[in-house]
């Protein structure tokens, strides 16, 4: 797979879980003999939701909730077949969204 690059993009609501997952991916790929660039932290996406506390009136009383999406980017330069195989068999937590592009 000479000249190729695999780009892995991780998303999660918990920054500790996404950092552990990125560390696990980097360790398995480097043990398989490929070179890794990253993990690169991407900007955190912050969604704020404004909700009226009362169901009927008192519009001035509101509550704000926020949801943060943490993102990391990992590039694997010149992946070996062993590295690709180890990537396919890695176990990661369910709350981490993974996008892999070749």
Curated annotation (Swiss-Prot):
Stored SMART domains: Ribosomal_S10
Gene Ontology molecular function terms on file: structural constituent of ribosome; tRNA binding
One GO term of the biological process aspect: translation
HAMAP family: Ribosomal_uS10
Subunit structure, interactors included: Part of the 30S ribosomal subunit.
Purpose of the protein: Involved in the binding of tRNA to the ribosomes.
Protein name as it appears in the record: Small ribosomal subunit protein uS10
